[in-house]
Amino acid sequence: MKKNVLITLLAALLLSSCGEYNKLLKSTDYEYKYEAAKNYFAKGQYSRAATLLNELIAILKGTDKAEESLYMLGMSYYNQKDYQTAAQTFTQYYNVYPRGTFTELARFHAGK
């Protein structure tokens, strides 16, 4: 009995978290998406972070969040072991932000 209740609660929790993520993907609240991407990144959910950040890069261009977003996108790919895409993203980062906060780290991760 207790086992069935526990399984039901766990399934409901998993389904609700997937539902929240899907709502987030459809949302036009880019500030909320940015904060969610940072949270996913901090929790090690790099695939979800990369999906959100990939969408936000063009939208955040020219803002104070653009630099950090591009670096987090590169690190998300890197942490998923997608080294080729990570290197391309890091190269883009240090070309766009040659004196940026993360330029040295981006060059390191790009192998430059």
Regions inferred by a protein language model and the residue ranges of each:
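Bacterial signal peptide processing site
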Residues: 19-22
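C-terminal motif of bacterial Sec signal peptides marking the signal peptidase cleavage site
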Residues: 15-17
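Short solvent-exposed coil/turn linkers within tandem alpha-helical repeat scaffolds
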Residues: 24-26, 58-66, 94-103
